[in-house]
Amino acid sequence: MALRKPPLSHPLRILVALLGVAGVLATAPWPRLQLILHVITVVALAPDPRGYLTTGLVAALSGWALEGSLKLYPRLGGSPWAALTIALIAAFLAEHWPPESRLRWMVRMLGLSLGLFLLTQGMVFLAAGSLPTARPWLWVFGTLPLWAYLAWRDQPARP
């Protein structure tokens, strides 16, 4: 079954994802907004089944931007590694099982966001020991319907 072509071309999609990384850096004074932009970049903007290399690079850049801008966070690579892994999983899912409905897309985004949270916590724990979990993740899950709906429109879906 052929997929419909997404509205954004490949170079434009990369540019939008890089703007997401720049947004992660620019929102450093506001950690809640920064985390929301990081999750949107890793889970919704970076994954592109047409280019796994760019998917990985943009996700890792977003992870390093987040990790490098937080003051009390160890800079040992836990966030970029988790972001890289989740973005590649999301790209694989988009290639082999494109979203068929908006509800399934939102459930997928929720699962990938939760996976990013757990994997990031696990990698940071392995690198530096336990850290307190902050409330910004509640903001991520609370705003999920908004950003998942906005990202839904650019996904290749079954005809």
Residue spans for each PLM region:
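Terminal, non-globular segments
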Residues: 2-159
